[in-house]
């Protein structure tokens, strides 16, 4: 199970209805944050995303993406946390991130590691990885992609029974691609196991202009979370501030062949009424939604549509 919970969807500053950037990402039993703007920990409480965060993936060190880290670390310490936490950021981010961590150093009793990442680097787990990719924001900035490993192909249990293979460890060996011997016969795994099935991919752009790197990283992604700070009427402003319009984000999703586009990082002018942004994007890429604080989206295995799990509480 992969679940995204939007903790903050506003650009630059919070509004009454939207906090600044933060997304809780749950992959099975693992929990991460993509960005951590001010007030993120309160949003985590409000939307019950959990505090067992293993790592924070920072896209860049602008205030609306990192100022929530200090308070979050203090709260974790007050809760008795002992496990270490890793903060991943782009090149050149260590000095700022270290200063943010040190603001709460007297209250943090667990290890915090800061890791700078180039494109292609990041966190590796048994069945997935979270890697950085370069974006265009006029400063050192990256996006992040959660990429699952391919899953094993389907195992034909019926055929295995017909071939006289006893249930038990041999089934597992064959499913893992290992040939086995039964009554003097060598059974090849390829006879019983189908082709590997692709894992899921979730891509988060962070703040950026539309760029080829995001398109490439989001190629056939299940979900692309892309910033849409402005509408098309502010295209010039988006260009000189290093941001994207809803149309820009939609064109990226279309070129990448993404499954669904979720728009975030909205200017305060759109906070209360996002219909224009959504219509603008959908005219190019129909499978688009504007994210809102508290929206929880599950990304299923590639056999069905995403389902919205929870409405934000009022």
Q: What is each model feature region?
A:
Residues 34-37, 54-61, 90, 203-208, ...:
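Active-site neighborhood of phospho(di)ester-bond hydrolases with catalytic His/Asp-centered motifs
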Residues 5, 88, 113-117, 131-133, ...:
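General small-molecule cofactor/ligand-binding pocket signal
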Residues 81-116, 269:
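Active-site neighborhood of divalent metal-dependent phosphoester bond hydrolases
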Residues 111, 277-294:
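Structural recognition of alpha->loop->beta junctions
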Residues 68-76, 100, 271-280:
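Metal-dependent catalytic neighborhoods of phosphoester/phosphodiester hydrolases
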Residues 24, 118-263, 271-284, 300-314:
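Metal-dependent phosphodiesterase/nuclease catalytic metal-binding core
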Residues 38-88, 116:
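Active-site metal-binding motif and surrounding structural segment of the metallo-beta-lactamase
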Residues 1-49, 144-146, 153, 194-205, ...:
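Conserved beta-strand hairpin/beta-sheet module of binuclear metal-dependent hydrolase folds
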């Amino acid at each position: 199970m992969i679940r995204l919970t939007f903790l903050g969807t506003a650009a630059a500053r919070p509004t009454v209805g939207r906090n600044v950037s933060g997304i809780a990402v749950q992959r099975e039993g693992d929990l991460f944050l993509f960005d951590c703007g001010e007030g993120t920990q309160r949003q985590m409480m409000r939307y019950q995303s959990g505090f067992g965060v293993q790592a924070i993936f920072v896209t860049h060190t602008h205030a609306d993406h990192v100022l929530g880290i200090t308070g979050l670390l203090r709260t974790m310490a007050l809760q008795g946390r002992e496990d270490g936490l890793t903060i991943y950021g782009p090149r050149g981010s260590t000095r700022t991130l270290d200063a943010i961590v040190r603001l709460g150093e007297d209250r943090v009793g667990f290890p915090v590691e800061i890791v700078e990442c180039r494109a292609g680097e990041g966190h590796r787990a048994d069945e997935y990885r979270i890697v950085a990719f370069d974006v265009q924001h006029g400063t050192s900035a990256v996006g992040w992609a959660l990429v699952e490993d391919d899953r094993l192909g389907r195992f034909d249990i019926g055929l295995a029974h017909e071939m006289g293979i006893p249930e038990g460890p041999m089934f597992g060996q064959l499913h893992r691609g290992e040939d086995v011997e039964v009554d003097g016969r060598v059974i090849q795994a390829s006879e019983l196991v189908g082709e590997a099935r692709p894992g899921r991919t979730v891509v988060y752009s962070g703040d950026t202009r539309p760029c080829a790197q995001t398109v490439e990283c989001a190629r056939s992604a299940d979900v692309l979370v892309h910033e849409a700070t402005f509408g098309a009427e502010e295209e010039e402003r988006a260009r000189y501030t290093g941001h994207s319009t809803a149309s820009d984000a939609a064109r990226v999703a279309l070129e990448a062949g993404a499954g669904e586009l979720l728009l975030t990082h909205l200017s305060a002018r759109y906070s209360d009424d996002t219909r224009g942004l959504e219509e603008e994007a959908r005219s190019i890429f129909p499978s688009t939604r504007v994210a809102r604080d508290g929206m929880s989206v599950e990304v299923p295995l590639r056999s069905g549509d995403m389902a919205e799990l929870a409405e934000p509480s009022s």
